[in-house]
UniProtKB/Swiss-Prot annotation:
Keywords: Disulfide bond, Ion channel impairing toxin, Knottin, Neurotoxin, Secreted, Signal, Toxin, Voltage-gated sodium channel impairing toxin
SUPFAM superfamilies attached to this UniProt entry: omega toxin-like
Miscellaneous field: Exists in two forms, due to cis-trans isomerization at Pro-75.
InterPro entries with a match to the protein in the record: Beta/delta-agatoxin_fam (IPR016328)
Keyword Iron-sulfur: no
Family per record: Belongs to the neurotoxin 07 (Beta/delta-agtx) family.
Signal sequence annotation: 1-23
Listed name of the protein: U2-hexatoxin-Hi1a
Length: 83
């Protein structure tokens, strides 16, 4: 039983590392800290004017004064802060 649990946890860890490494190529263009601080300007251009849509990489700048809310990255939508 211990071996099975250990194997399952190792597989889950490997899959999560593989998904992280295969992240969107847009992320390689700037440092992660810069994206967290300022948002990715290339993604911000893709925001809808009425701020009904956002992406996990654009941050809340698309949604002002709302927050960008995502369920497992997609679909993302702008929602009031209380949600």
């Amino acid at each position: 039983m211990r071996n099975t649990t250990f194997l399952v946890l190792n597989v889950m860890l490997l899959v999560s590392v593989a998904l992280f490494c295969a992240a969107d190529p847009e992320m390689e263009k700037s440092s992660f800290a810069e994206i967290l601080d300022t948002g990715n300007p290339e993604q911000e251009r893709k925001c809808l004017a009425e701020a009904a849509d956002c992406s996990p990489w654009s941050g809340d700048s698309c949604c002002k004064p709302y927050l960008c809310s995502c369920i497992f990255f997609y679909p993302c939508s702008c929602r009031p802060k209380g949600w």
